[in-house]
């Protein structure tokens, strides 16, 4: 019996060693995929239209909704385009507060245009009929 148990233990050790070798062989293949630095770079976009939903902004206090909506537009443009500076068109700000300072619109369609290196202009997108 003792010989049988030692033989099974040796077989188990061999199989575990083979499994470890297989795992080590697979690790370098996974490491050669995209790195964090490659993921951080955003693709360059010249002109782009997007719809921003202000649901998060509307949830909060009434008196600061306009300010938060403008900040949220900046945040979304920075997030999608990798911009450092975002310029908001006054017409867009007026469209957000069309119903009043406390009752902002639910969503707005904006057109984003690149005007410099990492500088973008966010303006109201007007549908052509």
Curated annotation (Swiss-Prot):
<dbReference type="GO" id="GO:1990904">
    <property type="term" value="C:ribonucleoprotein complex"/>
</dbReference>
<dbReference type="GO" id="GO:0006412">
    <property type="term" value="P:translation"/>
</dbReference>
<keyword id="KW-0689">Ribosomal protein</keyword>
<comment type="similarity">
    <text>Belongs to the eukaryotic ribosomal protein eL31 family.</text>
</comment>
<protein>
    <recommendedName>
        <fullName>Large ribosomal subunit protein eL31</fullName>
    </recommendedName>
</protein>
<feature type="region of interest" description="Disordered">
    <location>
        <begin position="1"/>
        <end position="46"/>
    </location>
</feature>
<dbReference type="InterPro" id="IPR000054">
    <property type="entry name" value="Ribosomal_eL31"/>
</dbReference>
<keyword id="KW-0687">Ribonucleoprotein</keyword>
<feature type="compositionally biased region" description="Basic and acidic residues">
    <location>
        <begin position="9"/>
        <end position="27"/>
    </location>
</feature>
<dbReference type="InterPro" id="IPR023621">
    <property type="entry name" value="Ribosomal_eL31_dom_sf"/>
</dbReference>
<dbReference type="Pfam" id="PF01198">
    <property type="entry name" value="Ribosomal_L31e"/>
</dbReference>
<dbReference type="GO" id="GO:0005840">
    <property type="term" value="C:ribosome"/>
</dbReference>
<dbReference type="GO" id="GO:0003735">
    <property type="term" value="F:structural constituent of ribosome"/>
</dbReference>
<feature type="compositionally biased region" description="Basic and acidic residues">
    <location>
        <begin position="35"/>
        <end position="46"/>
    </location>
</feature>
